[in-house]
């Protein structure tokens, strides 16, 4: 499945992208580096290896050694692929007031190009398994192989390919932090349960982009793209703000023979990083996220378990 996504997204970079259309912070550190339907060939094994590597660090929860080690790895990989890398650190406040030492990681390809595409995923993991059928597991963390690492793994493989063949436009890959620290089910009677307890890193970046006045033609979020037989419906917020790009990408998928994965039907709305970026920057963004229309919450059974 990852290979299908990577093929599609390489098409997005080289084809669709050619059309016009309480917090305390630390300073951003910049690290400078010393129409067709035929997509380049990507390495699915490489993408899965990036997922496995992230999981090997342990739970990527803010304020933990595993989180820092994984962040260092992501920075080093983007630099290795030739990106101009920015690290945006901030102390963000969790639903219960816990200060989260957070780190958004940005890799820019063709940084001098005015025309830009934004690709993003979250790299943190949820500290709670609050949807597990066994209440004894609700306060246990997730390994985040699908929810977090899969989107990052796909983007790392795209970054590797761009390091070998630069796209014709500017591309910014962002790994957002503190997406998955929202109010858990077991604490909703004590704490605020609004959507602003989620997606803290992306909302912070939207208010404080790594380059003042940053703009992109459009943005694409990858979330939970690694499960077996994952299928992607046209998410509601994506269709509201970025319908043109959703339709183009789904058409490319259909032309490449992936129509059984990219379903030409509307799905529900999801509180996710794309919504925060849209609200804070006005950049039209879409969310490619595994959707189960037969599930009460719209997600597969392994979500937050």
Go through each PLM region and give its residues.
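C-terminal motif of bacterial Sec signal peptides marking the signal peptidase cleavage site
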Residues: 12-15
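Short, low-complexity, disordered segments immediately C-terminal to signal peptides
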Residues: 17-35
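N-terminal capping segment at the start of a domain
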Residues: 29-70, 81, 296-305
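Acidic/histidine-rich catalytic neighborhood of metal-dependent amide-processing enzymes
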Residues: 139-244
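Active-site-adjacent substrate-binding region
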Residues: 89, 99, 218, 225-305
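Solvent-exposed loop/turn segments at secondary-structure junctions
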Residues: 61-62, 91-94, 111-113, 123-127, ...
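A non-catalytic alpha/beta surface segment that caps or lines the substrate-entry region
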Residues: 52, 59-112
